[in-house]
Amino acid sequence: MATSRFQAFLNSPIGPKTTHFWGPIANWGFVAAGLVDMQKPPEMISGNMSSAMCVYSALFMRFAWMVQPRNYLLLACHASNETVQLYQLSRWARAQGYLSSKKEEEKPSQ
């Protein structure tokens, strides 16, 4: 019984013999790299690259949803990457002063 289920998974349209499986597995590297980069100082973050990764992941989330059969593994991968990259982008924007509040800017210097 377990062997037949495993055999069915191997030969399915989303199984490990297809790019539908290995593409998302390889893309988890982007998520891992983003998580590792959270330990680095915000000055090391590239705003352009983080923005590009946000657009890339948003586009591929839509692709993963629209392709038949739906690729939930790819969708989860890019949703995770979108979250990580938006956090990195916010760290970069805060370090560049784009997210400072008006109260901080209006404080008189002593």
Curated annotation (Swiss-Prot):
InterPro entries documented for this protein: MPC (IPR005336)
GO biological process, one term: mitochondrial pyruvate transmembrane transport
Ranges that cross the membrane: 20-36, 44-61
Predominant cellular place of this UniProt entry's protein: mitochondrion
GO cellular component: a single term: plastid
Subcellular location: Mitochondrion inner membrane
Membrane topology: Multi-pass membrane protein
Pfam families on file: MPC (PF03650)
Keywords assigned by UniProt, alphabetized: Membrane, Mitochondrion, Mitochondrion inner membrane, Transmembrane, Transmembrane helix, Transport
Function text: Mediates the uptake of pyruvate into mitochondria.
Protein name, as recorded: Mitochondrial pyruvate carrier 1
